[in-house]
Amino acid sequence: IAIVDCSDYPKPVCSLEYMPLCGSDSKTYSNKCDFCNAVVDSNGTLTLSHFGKC
């Protein structure tokens, strides 16, 4: 199981760095910050499916 530590999030601004992550919602997030902000918004229901594009 792939795990990302989102304890430092949410953050108001994300970098434009591209390191894609695939969420459990089958959406590709451009980087950890975008993904972790979405995890916080989902109240923890969103999880990481795998690293890379969906």
UniProtKB/Swiss-Prot annotation:
Pfam families tied to this protein: Kazal_1
UniProt keyword terms in alphabetical order: Disulfide bond, Glycoprotein, Protease inhibitor, Repeat, Secreted, Serine protease inhibitor
Entry keyword Cell inner membrane: no
Record's keyword annotation contains Glycoprotein: yes
Glycan-linked positions: 43
Site (Reactive bond 3): 16-17
Top-level division of the source organism's lineage: Eukaryota
SMART domains: KAZAL (SM00280)
Domain Kazal-like: residue ranges: 4-54
InterPro entries hit by this protein: Bifunctional_prot_inhibitor, Kazal_dom, Kazal_dom_sf, Prot_inh_Kazal-m
SS bonds (residue pairs): 6-36, 14-33, 22-54
UniProt-annotated location(s): Secreted
GO cellular component entries: extracellular region
GO molecular function term, any single one: serine-type endopeptidase inhibitor activity
PANTHER family for the chain: OVOMUCOID-LIKE-RELATED, SERINE PEPTIDASE INHIBITOR, KAZAL TYPE 2, TANDEM DUPLICATE 1-RELATED
Description of its domains: Avian ovomucoid consists of three homologous, tandem Kazal family inhibitory domains.
Name this polypeptide is given: Ovomucoid
Organism: Gyps coprotheres
